[in-house]
């Protein structure tokens, strides 16, 4: 049979998932006017890619985030791929000590002071795509949830907590901070920029009046996505059958997303 098309899409590759989920409930107090109970769950899951004929990448996130999510046999979906940063060039001696700039002109070497130093992973004396490595995993080690219910007579208070642990997040918002003249700079990035006086504590490269600079997709943009959240608070009062033809009357209120504790910016 012939379709007339020059190419044909086909499915290949597979993903294996293995996991475990545990649930439990504890009745901590059970009195006439007072009850207190907890129920929770925790889930573990691991996935693994297989059956690919070569490495490939998930769709580009946006113009400045290409080839961030690596798909490779033996790795999980959501693996982050990029360069590894190795501090900053603090002085001309550090620039010259790097084989990449050992023969650079004086002007080029001076321009590199205060710039990000990337790890030459394969030690070939230059920074290329071959120096990229796995820099994160968006899959959590585990996710969990906890309900706590406290009742006093007709009044019931319910709390629901949830969270994850061990998952990384690629913070694409940070890729817009180029420390150059083409875009805005956040106050935090500006205050923590490289300067000769702040070299030891710098988190961002020096500012420049140039339109652009070479800032590679690196572990700079990977953050710990673990979080602990009080998702909901429910308060309920049961009036019982205080009105004829109404067997039960309750009034309740709910607050959502009360607070979140996380290191993600």
What is the predicted function of each stretch?
Residues 164-256:
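Extracytoplasmic gating/loop element in the C-terminal half of outer-membrane beta-barrel translocons
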Residues 1-4, 53-63, 174-183, 265:
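Flexible, surface-exposed loop regions and adjacent strand-edge segments
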Residues 3-6, 16-20, 42-48, 139-144, ...:
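Transmembrane beta-barrel architecture of outer-membrane proteins
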Residues 45-49, 158, 165-169, 259-262:
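Flexible loop/turn segments at secondary-structure boundaries
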Residues 1-6, 63, 122-129, 206-219, ...:
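Flexible, solvent-exposed coil segments and beta strand-coil junctions
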